[in-house]
Amino acid sequence: MSKTNKSKSGSRSSRSRSASRSRSRSFSKSRSRSRSVSRSRKRRLSSRSRSRSYSPAHNRERNHPRVYQNRDFRGHNRGYRRPYYFRGRNRGFYPWGQYNRGGYGNYRSNWQNYRQAYSPRRGRSRSRSPKRRSPSPRSRSHSRNSDKSSSDRSRRSSSSRSSSNHSRVESSKRKSTKEKKSSSKDSRPSQAAGDNQGDEAKEQTFSGGTSQDIKGSESSKPWPDATTYGTGSASRASVSDLSPRERSPALKSPLQSVVVRRRSPRPSPVPKPSPPLSNASQMGSSMSGGAGYQSGAHQGPFDHGSGSLSPSKKSPVGKSPPATGSAYGSSQKEESAASGGAAYTKRYLEEQKTENGKDKEQKQTNTDKEKLKEKGGFSDADVKMKSDPFAPKTDTEKPFRGSQSPKRYKLRDDFEKKMADFHKEEMDEQDKDKCKGRKEPEFDDEPKFISKVIAGASKNQEEEKSGKWESLHAGKEKQRKAEELEEEPFTERSRKEERGGSKRSESGHRGFVPEKNFRVTAYKAVQEKSSSPPPRKTSESRDKLGNKGDFSSGKSSFSITREAQVNVRMDSFDEDLARPSGLLAQERKLCRDLVHSNKKEQEFRSIFQHIQSAQSQRSPSELFAQHIVTIVHHVKEHHFGSSGMTLHERFTKYLKRGNEQEAAKTKKSPEIHRRIDISPSTFRKHGLTHEELKSPREPGYKAEGKYKDDPVDLRLDIERRKKHKERDLKRGKSRESVDSRDSSHSRERSTEKTEKTHKGSKKQKKHRRARDRSRSSSSSSQSSHSYKAEEYPEEAEDREESTTGFDKSRLGTKDFVGPNERGGRARGTFQFRARGRGWGRGNYSGNNNNNSNNDFQKRSREEEWDPEYTPKSKKYYLHDDREGEGSDKWMSRGRGRGAFPRGRGRFMFRKSSTSPKWAHDKFSGEEGEIEDDESGTENREEKDSLQPSAE
């Protein structure tokens, strides 16, 4: 079916191109429509939700309901699913609809909420027949997804389908295609037969000119006037210009304009003449016969509540129907002729006649405009307004459709009738509510549909009338919102007419508001309206039109067209409305269109116009709030200059201050701890430490510090060595027993406890060693001097290389101390550090006790070196960067330390790793020094706390 329809629509679209541009325009639209036809068939066949038809039929079909479930879930079917289920753009990779209930985007269409367990289509198709599923899911999904094409499709098709959608839609589609191929009139009755249920009103309206249908007859009653007038006006002139066949469509075109505007595309038999009509005077007759016809059909069926309110309303539309048929037909002639015809199909046929008929129709359009204006301004503006509000969409769409297969026209006409009626009724309500502000949106909504039809015509018409309608660019842009850029010119024109006529249209819309009720009471209202209410409404709208004046006639015609056509349209519209899905879809689209059309119109106006229009609609509170906000901004801007600081700068400032304070604290704390941790020699050394902080930290090397401060450090450390060697040797022997170097890394981490204890002794050693090693390089070295004092007995001995009890530690330490002193210290120290501290001051006290003397001294050197060294390493690190020596020692120490400190105790973790690498990386010498001090402080604190405990 879809291929058949597609081929038909392809042929139709080619025909459409030959027959009218509207089809070619619709080739995208019509193509989506013919696809919609094919899709509706597909949906009937495969119950395809739009994305679903793309999914593999074999697995997606009920054949594998559970396989499909597997697809729902991540099963092996995932392979199938990926190609077929398109992930939603925003869904991420969630093939199973679990995260996105859409499965792969299209897996579960967003528009349908169905549990993942059963295929959205499948699960529903299981419960539903494809037909049912196709109408409502499709209208549901399509109304959501492609409001226009799919809404047109789904509503038109689904509404048509709802009554006799498949037979009618398919028959009307097929017949329309065939009828388009063959005489549409003959097949039109068959279509009417096929489409009798839903299309009966439409085809009646549609056949209104032919008086094929009851409504056609009813419409024909008003329409004879319309026909007479239409024939007299551009439509008649067009019809006169056109072949009699076209002329009869022209007669219909009044009727079509009024009632058949939608139908007439569907009575494509007449729109067939209407395409010939359109052919001869491409849109004059096609637009009057097809556009007007469509105006009637579209407005009639579509616009039961629409401007082409049924023939009866256009019995006064008698003026108006010709106005609509003629003027609108002329407008659409101009539009279609300008647009290249309602469609290329019409355009092709029409181009044969168009050059005659087009000019004629354009002339007639002008003539009709003049006539209609003479006739109360019920002319071109009126017809346009009748037609244009809808005809821009609908009427033009109708010639468009008239060119297109009647089947499509039917579907589309039904849909668009419903859509347009719904839109127009909605818009009429909203127009009445918002009157002028919203009327244009209504028109926009209608122009959206019309613009679809007219899109083809709009392009040429845009060319022709773009100059005219430039003022309608806002309307154009609404239509753009209607997604009908091509249709914009026509829509613009419609909007101009709508805008110009919008006031009249307001009255028309207000008159039309009941027709929203008609939507509810569609058949009854349509029947009544088609006979008596249409005259009443026709009188109302005619009075309104007459009151409105020439241009107002455009909108009055629009209103009347709506109202008159509302009567006719209400049947098919009621079919749609009778269907909750169609009604909801239409309402949804109408609301969306109205909202967006207003927005878009305002969006594309100049900011001042936009503001004015927006303000005009604002409540006083809104205006007041806006005023206050404006004042606040003004005052702030002019009277409260910002400091010019960015938030980043402001918070960075706070961070810097905090860092400085912390740095100061860290500097102080190591010193304080040193004093606390260290004996008088420590205080001496601490004084040295300050000096060292000043000079040695900058001096960069522990080795430098050692050598610089060695005299001092040795002096201080000698005393401490004497004191601490004994302590440290005792402690160290007990602690050295631990193979600190072997267990150093684990011990490093764990040894801070032991290190703390050991640090107590080491601090003495360190101070000695620091002095031996002259760790004047930094306060860290000083802090580590307290460690060094402990280590320094060892290190001093190492330096002294006296082979006393510390020889082992010296050897081990010295091996590393040499490098450390030489600048290789860092790594030796690292090992020592990790091992030394790690050797288990607290944690590895057992090991320390075992190997404590040699290892301890070694460890203490390393540890003392490393804690001490770590600060110095930082300092050396930083200073090495500064001094250049540090690069070697820094590389060996700082880096080694940086890597090693992690192995060390907590001290290394927080401080040494942080301070050597981090300080260097941060290139904050102060921070490095600070951290050195901190590390020294921590070491000393640990040592002090542990020293007493160790001692």
Swiss-Prot record:
Cross-link Glycyl lysine isopeptide (Lys-Gly) (interchain with G-Cter in SUMO1): residue positions: K202, K384, K448
Residue segments, region Required for mRNA splicing activation: 2-190
Pro residues: bias regions: 266-276
Entry keyword annotation includes Ubl conjugation: yes
Bias type Basic and acidic residues, positions: 58-75, 144-155, 167-188, 347-387, 411-449, 460-483, 490-518, 537-547, 659-677, 688-758, 877-891
Modified positions (Phosphotyrosine) in chain numbering: Y328
Cross-link (Glycyl lysine isopeptide (Lys-Gly) (interchain with G-Cter in SUMO2)): 202, 215, 221, 252, 333, 346, 353, 375, 384, 386, 393, 398, 418, 424, 448, 452, 459, 465, 468, 476, 481, 524, 548, 555, 599, 694, 702, 706, 708, 753, 756, 872, 875
Superkingdom assignment: Eukaryota
SUBUNIT field: Associated with the large multiprotein complex TRAP (Mediator complex-like). Interacts with SFPQ; the interaction is dependent on SFPQ phosphorylation at 'Thr-687' and inhibits binding of SFPQ to an ESS1 exonic splicing silencer element-containing RNA. Interacts with NXF1. Component of the SNARP complex which consists at least of SNIP1, SNW1, THRAP3, BCLAF1 and PNN. Associated with spliced mRNP complexes. Interacts with HELZ2 and PPARG. Interacts with CLOCK and BMAL1.
Protein name: Thyroid hormone receptor-associated protein 3
